A protein has these predicted regions:
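Active-site- and interface-proximal helix/loop "cap" or "latch" segments in soluble metabolic
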Residues: 1-6, 12-130, 134-183
């Protein structure tokens, strides 16, 4: 996301397939879904110990998965699959519909994200949340964007997140020592 996003905040979590956790955050402003972000955390027993118990979305997991021989065949990573589901939600402006999934990330979608989003649909469509979301993302010419997210509940800050998001392409990052961190 770029710019400023404001709205009612909804979040959910679902445990699936022996300990994987699917997460969803949805922001609605004046009846319109303006932001959605999915994430996944594998169990502590995950076969690749460096990712066991760690969220995958904005980590090096996408690079790890892209190096897998299986990915050579599918050309899809979990992050691609999450982005595709998010795009469908924003396009359809609802959470409860027939999702399409990408081969190579469909287990997480079918067993985690899609059931979670369908469970959340009644809450998101049914009532105003007592949590508010303010997110600001500012891109810079350096190839790095800063992102600040603040979640309020009853007028008090209950969560605060800050992240620096590196460009998708190494050459867009001006500082050579930071180029290895491209998305």
């Amino acid at each position: 996301p770029k710019g400023i996003i404001v709205g009612d905040y909804y979040s959910g979590q679902k445990v699936f397939d022996g300990g994987y956790e699917a997460y969803a955050e949805v922001v609605v402003n004046n009846g319109e879904i303006v932001h959605i972000e999915l994430n996944e955390r594998p169990p502590l027993t995950y076969y690749a110990s460096e990712w066991a118990g760690e969220t995958k979305r904005r980590s090096g997991y996408g690079f790890f998965q892209a190096k897998s021989p299986r990915t050579d065949y599918t050309l899809v990573t979990l992050i691609n699959g999450m982005s595709y589901l998010e795009w469908q939600v924003l396009k359809n402006q609802k959470l409860d519909f027939e999702y399409k999934t990408l081969f190579g990330s469909s287990n997480s979608a079918r067993n985690g994200f899609v059931p979670l989003l369908k469970e959340m649909s009644k809450e998101v469509q049914g009532k105003t949340s007592n949590k508010r979301y303010v997110g600001i993302t500012q891109p810079y010419d350096s190839g790095i964007s800063t992102r600040l997210e603040v979640i309020y509940e009853n007028g008090k800050i209950v969560d605060l997140k800050y992240d620096e998001i590196f460009a998708d392409d190494k050459k867009d990052i001006k500082n050579k020592t930071l180029q290895e961190f491209y998305r």
